[in-house]
Amino acid sequence: MGAEQEGHVPGDFKETGYKDSHDYIQFKEHVIDGQLNRWSHTITREHDFPGAQAMLYGAGVPNKEMMKKAPHVGIATVWWEGNPCKYVNLLLLLDDTHHAAVLDFGKIVKKAVEKQGMLGWQFNTVGVSDAITMGGEGMRFSLQTREIIADSIESVTCAQHHDANISIPGCDKNMPGTIMAAARHNRPFIMIYGGTIMKGHSDLLEKPINISTCYEARGAFTYDRLHAKSNPGAEGRTPSDVLDDIEQHACPGAGACGGMYTANTMATAIEAMGLSLPGSSSYPALSPEKARECERAAEAIKVVMEKGLRPRDLMTRAAFENALVLTMILGGSTNGVLHFLAMANTADVPLTIDDVDRTSNRIPFLADLAPSGKYYMEDLYRVGGTPSVLKMLVAAGLIDGSVMTVTGRTLAENVADWPSLDPNQKIIRPLSNPIKQTGHIRILRGNLAPEGAVAKITGKEGLSFTGTARVFDKEHELDVALSAGSIRREDGNLVLIVRYEGPKGGPGMPEQLRASAAIMGAGLDNVALVTDGRYSGASHGFIVGHVCPEAAVGGPLALVRNGDTVTINAETNRIDAVDVDEAEFERRRRDWKAPLPHVRRGVLGKYARLVGDASHGAVTDQSDPSW
């Protein structure tokens, strides 16, 4: 069985490095010289678990030698049909001479794992498509799928005694879910991002389009602002024809939404943390590099296992700071704030919304990427991708290049030989000429958000806004108002308050892209939007979300009334109802009654009972952080 390490014998218990041994269930780790089956050895050694071994033989373990010595690698694919992020029949260029149709990336990984002399076990977990559910009741199920994914992967990895895990997510909540699972099971781990979609093109608009175009077009359609360009092919086309054209061509194939929306925000941040292979976040789903990455991941996970690198070894404070820096540089989604807090909470790394604010105060915004810019992830891929950006930031001292990664090398070593950004490219501005001197994500506080709120303000919309409150209890009420055309430019500056959409109140903290995009499409630049819900990574404009405490638990947002004057200031980081003093708030509080729970049973009812607040990541297994 191999030479035993000093101080260890087969079956010895080795502490796995958790901060609190009672936080997560502890498993025996067998440290045997030259063997990588440190957890599966529990059920495959000798004849202690004959039933388990019989089942494994039945599942495909070929012989006794593999049973006793081969490590078990779980391959977790977050997949379902009906979503291009998960599109299954991918035609992938595997080399320069031929194509091969594969069911999914997991099959490539499994085959490559087996080539390394290990046992690959595929399993699946699920999510929902934000773009499909946006604006409807289905969106309430979105955020809680992050917890389902983390719970599912933790369950299978631990119960099946896997020695390592390779996770393959492809959509917004998928990625933080896999990282949270990795922090829980703390076994050798690599994430493979499913990859970005290519941009679409509308002949009637004569420009590139993407999923965000669909939602903004709806606002333009409602306010009679959607028209075809004047070209021979557009003669006689109606606004409805233009909307048809957009819907049919916005998503031309496989991959996650192509701007610097939530999926690409999380993928790039996780690469900056060292938890995926170099280039993973910027390789398009249908690129030949993505298929080759799946093959390389099997080699890399073996190195990770041999070196004994654990997710918590990599998920350091410095790694999270790298993630925050890159998110500010690229103009990433506000959802990143929520997910970074949840990931850090799970890994017991102290991280707060104040850390987000400090990073934003010192890091410039450089990327001309959608939704606020004109380029897409595929464009960044063509000029060097995420590693080229990281190389620039390491050289400038903005990213900590000493953090260890899943390659077994440091981040600086990973990007050292990567091409530098072409000085003539237009996507990433030089540090000397940023789009904005500080980050686009601001943490606001004030009498409407004493525990914090998250604003996405690029500067294009200005840095402060004052308007008259117009209050909506649920997004649907605002959607009805927008559809009726009752939000008008001639009404003056308006601050639209959408409340009771937080983690508990929604429940599920749904994204408000339907509303925010409709406002942009309608050209309503006299409007700011404030909510205790979330925004899609595709949202832009003067938007404030994640308001804490949320309205459903009696937060000040529940006490705002139509006609109150609200000021939002991204320079002082304040959000206040300026004409409502504390005495008036107390009078209103006495009259306020908590709404009945929107849902009592099922997965959303359970979620509403368990979930913590957004300022701590909205996690369900620990409402308050341990620091």
Regions found by a protein language model. Name each.
Residues 2-71, 77-81, 90-95, 105-119, ...:
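Catalytic or ion-coupling anion/metal-binding cores of large enzyme and transporter domains
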Residues 84:
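Classical protein tyrosine phosphatase
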Residues 149, 175, 512-515:
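Amphipathic coiled-coil/heptad-repeat helices and related helical stalk/stem segments
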Residues 147-148, 191:
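Acidic, His- and aromatic-enriched active-site or binding-groove loops in soluble protein domains
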Residues 149-162, 244:
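An acidic, phosphate/nucleotide-engaging active-site surface
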Residues 156-178, 190-192:
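A short, small-residue-rich loop immediately preceding and capping a beta-strand
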